[in-house]
Amino acid sequence: MPTFSLWLPAGSNNVHPCGDPYAHHLFMRCLYHAKHDPTMKFDVKTTNVNKTSQEFKNTGLRRMPGISAEESGETQTFETEDDILDFLEYLKPERGDDEEAENATCDLFRQFARFVKDVEHRDTAFNTELLRLDKYLSEQETKFLISDDVTHIDCLVLTRLHSIRVAAKMLKNYEIPADLSHVLDYLKAGYATEMFRVSCPSDQEIVLHWTELKDTPRLSAKDRAKLVREEPVFSFSV
């Protein structure tokens, strides 16, 4: 079993991870695998993307997120999304049958991005995807997507869904409808999970991430500075 470091872009304080849901997903995935394999050893490191540390440069990685792994005295690096996810797929436990769950969630993030970027001015398509997820969850007899325990796909969907929830409220004054009770119960189950909470960025970092993307609503310099100065908030209740 290799020892590895997960490198993530630092957030506004140059210490804690940024609010990118992909970074949150990878952090949670690593915690998930570590929970199931006590021999697995990894750490999480951050650095400013605009002024990377010498330690990061020494790994040979050129971008983040990335993984630097040590095995038998040799160092390997993984920095494309496909390479990182392929590396994680070799870790225990094996992936379960999550094809139906993938089908129920595959368009949710894309439709939210279209909504928040005003490609879609109405929330209709986004709501349709949330309803699709709610229907899928209503037909399951499990706390999570395919099991009563977190699996690979939950690490992806929960982190995205939380990012969506926080950003939608701040940037579009949108809240997940109360009648989508299965989606809200799913989020509650995620929020009660230690690996989710440990890996989760603050609400402020999530908002900063979204407002720095192309075509998304921008914050004024004053509002951005206010967010950075605030005590970190973690919205773990719905």
Curated annotation (Swiss-Prot):
Protein's recorded name: Chloride intracellular channel exl-1
UniProt family annotation: Belongs to the chloride channel CLIC family.
Keyword line: Chloride, Chloride channel, Cytoplasm, Golgi apparatus, Ion channel, Ion transport, Lysosome, Membrane, Transport, Voltage-gated channel
Swiss-Prot/TrEMBL domain comment: Members of this family may change from a globular, soluble state to a state where the N-terminal domain is inserted into the membrane and functions as a chloride channel. A conformation change of the N-terminal domain is thought to expose hydrophobic surfaces that trigger membrane insertion.
GO molecular function: chloride channel activity
InterPro entries: Glutathione-S-Trfase_C_sf
Tissue specificity as recorded in UniProt: Expressed in the intestine, neurons and muscles.
Gene Ontology CC entries for this record: apical plasma membrane; chloride channel complex; cytoplasm; endoplasmic reticulum; Golgi apparatus; Golgi membrane; lysosomal membrane; lysosome
Family annotation (Gene3D superfamilies): 1.20.1050.10, Glutaredoxin
Function: Probable chloride channel.
Lineage: Eukaryota, Metazoa, Ecdysozoa, Nematoda, Chromadorea
Organism of this sequence: Caenorhabditis elegans
